[in-house]
A protein has these predicted regions:
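Residue-level detector of short, conserved catalytic/binding motifs and their immediate flanks
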Residues: 61, 161, 222, 341-343
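Mid-length scaffold segments of soluble, non-membrane domains
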Residues: 270, 274-295
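Active-site-adjacent structural segments surrounding the nucleophilic cysteine of cysteine proteases
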Residues: 179-273
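Solvent-exposed, acidic/flexible segments
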Residues: 217-226, 275, 279, 301, ...
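Sec/Tat-exported extracytoplasmic proteins
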Residues: 228, 232-240, 256, 286-290, ...
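Extracytoplasmic soluble-region selector
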Residues: 2-181
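Noncatalytic regulatory segments and standalone regulatory/sensor domains
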Residues: 348-411
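Active-site-adjacent substructure of cysteine-protease-like catalytic cores
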Residues: 301-366
Length: 411
């Protein structure tokens, strides 16, 4: 304003940021008493003779005041309390601790056209709310996943993308995987971004593919456990990337079980009498092969549901067992198996369904057969806890084969 005196000193760092209705005292910003206050736009920010600033409306104004005869200039940014809008200078000047901004959604699985708003951790929520107008959201592949200024992501097509939220000098990432259930065939690869941004590839097998020399018949009858082990082992340990179920039998299974047990199941017994690896056996072999895991053998349904969903949200998989008997109704069905069956959970979708790797084709499923998208309850009704803590490496009933195995990324 032409009515303002000429300032001999311009102070712009830090800027004074206010929201409509706020009041501040200039003394606290300058550290000394002042006189002769002027505002370039009193409709935006007015100042009293005592140096009290009043934020009246959204916009910017300049305040000039005199301290010991020297005029100083301050810029005032006033934002709406419900929808803050901050300047580029403020974005650049905001300095926060390295871990100030974190999210509870490091990795997401979504289906095409689904939308979801990324959530901040409890330690970051207050900060994100306070500086909402400073948050910058970006997708590295907006043709796959779009993100708006509120952190709402929309899945557009199959693929993976990295969503970055930046606040001042810090940022956090969410890795989004847009998936379909179109995977089918004898063996197919499913790739995803993990919570660390690393690509992980699961090879999904059909157990009766008749593509496994020497073990075609065994795998067709009993191969669900071996296929599940091969899928997880190859995904979590690069030394075993792409390993076939037949190579698992002749490799890590033979290496980490006793010669007596391995020979009994693969040489001495008839095909009908041979047994698959137990969950205890799978867990043991994975640990011996450098893949960290936790075998949960007993649980209540409510505990397991919460635990399974929480683990899947980290982007890590779960190996589990189902049986013919429905634990809710007590009836026997052939929905998943006519005896016992091992499968792998790969993730939980933002719509609440789970992503399942299954080595058997299902007549009731209309999508691809290697990956299935189902309700978690559809699986949990057929899961069961261990009745004891048997250490049998091969199937020995509910004593060694109930529960589920949580897999962890190798650090």
């Amino acid at each position: 304003s032409s009515d303002l005196p000429e300032a001999s000193e311009i102070i712009t760092d830090p800027l004074i940021s206010m929201t409509v209705g706020d009041t501040k005292n200039l003394y606290f910003f300058h550290g000394d008493s002042a006189s002769a206050y002027f505002s370039s736009n009193p409709n935006i920010a007015s100042v009293t003779t005592g140096g009290v600033l009043n934020a009246n409306d959204v916009g910017s104004a300049e305040i000039i005041y005199s301290v010991h005869g020297v005029f100083h200039q301050r810029k005032i940014n006033v934002a709406d309390i419900e929808n803050p809008s901050f300047s580029t200078t403020q974005r650049e000047n905001l300095i926060l601790p390295d871990n100030a901004l974190t999210t509870t959604d490091p990795v997401l699985f979504m289906q095409k056209k689904d939308s979801y708003t990324i959530q901040f951790s409890s330690s970051s929520q207050a900060l994100a709310t306070r500086y909402k107008g400073l948050l910058i959201w970006k997708s590295d592949k907006p043709n796959i996943v779009r993100v708006d200024s509120n952190g709402k992501v929309t899945a557009l097509k199959k693929g993976s993308a990295t969503i970055t939220c930046t606040l001042g000098n810090v940022s956090c990432h969410t890795y989004v995987n847009v998936i379909t259930d179109s995977y089918t065939g004898k063996a197919t690869d499913f790739s995803m971004l993990t919570a660390t941004g690393k690509q992980r590839t699961y090879r999904l097998f059909k157990q009766n593919a008749h593509n496994y020399p020497r073990y075609d018949s065994y795998l067709a009858w009993h191969g669900c456990a071996t296929c599940s082990l091969a899928t997880v082992l190859g995904a979590y340990n690069d030394n075993y990337s792409g390993i076939l179920p037949s190579s698992v039998i002749d490799g890590v299974e033979k290496q980490f079980t006793s010669n007596k047990d391995w020979t009994r199941e693969h040489v001495n017994r008839s095909l009908r009498g041979q047994m698959p690896l137990s969950l205890y056996g799978i867990s043991s072999i994975l640990k011996s092969s450098g893949v960290d895991n936790n075998y949960v053998r007993t649980y209540t349904d409510s505990e397991a549901k919460h635990d399974i969903i929480s683990h899947l949200k980290t982007g890590n998989s779960i190996i589990f067992e189902v049986r013919q008997k429905n634990s809710r109704t007590g009836k026997r069905t052939k929905r998943w198996t006519n005896s016992y069956h091992t499968m792998v959970l790969l993730g939980v979708l933002t719509n609440g369904k789970v992503l399942l790797c299954d080595s058997v084709d299902r007549s009731w499923y209309n999508g691809g057969q290697r990956l299935k998208i189902v309700d978690l309850s559809d699986i949990m009704e057929y899961m069961f806890p261990c009745t004891s803590f048997s250490e049998s490496m091969y199937y020995n009933g509910a004593s060694s084969d109930g529960g589920y195995i949580k897999i962890y990324e190798i650090s």
